[in-house]
Amino acid sequence: PTTVIFPESPMNFMYHDDREFQQFIGDFARRNNVSVLFNSAEPDSTNGKYFNSAVMVGPDGKKLDQYDKLYLLPFGEAVPWVLESIVPAFVGNFSYGREYDLFPLGDAKAGVMICFESHFGQLSREYVRNGADVIIEMTNDGYLGPTPVLRQHLANAVFRAVETNRPVLRVTHV
């Protein structure tokens, strides 16, 4: 393989802030001669918050790129601005991403959707307009259990594949 992709995590990892984690991922990438795509909370230098991000480290162990989640889960990752002063910040306080970044995936280009973003067809369509050959969905569906939501989340990925005519690689805990 040229790339190892991990599912969305419950934000236990902060690549930018954790030198030990950087060393671990870098060593893994170099030892296996692969790129590694994983989920991480990465700092937003404009406001002191963090992004829910997908980070790619190359086979040389160095960070290649980062995508910051554009569509945050209301109340889980961000509080709608109207309610920010009413609802406690611990409910969700991530920054919204600003760019439709693509990652190298072998000879292809990939757009990444993180969890809830699979609900938004405009995201995958924008990736394709920007040159994506494949869409990757990184998600942590383990907390959903055997509920209808689990099946609906999977169905969203199928819709994204059909409407973009691109394969969707779904990486999850379930």
Regions found by a protein language model. Name each.
Residues 1-174:
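Enzyme catalytic cores with a strong preference for nitrogen-chemistry domains
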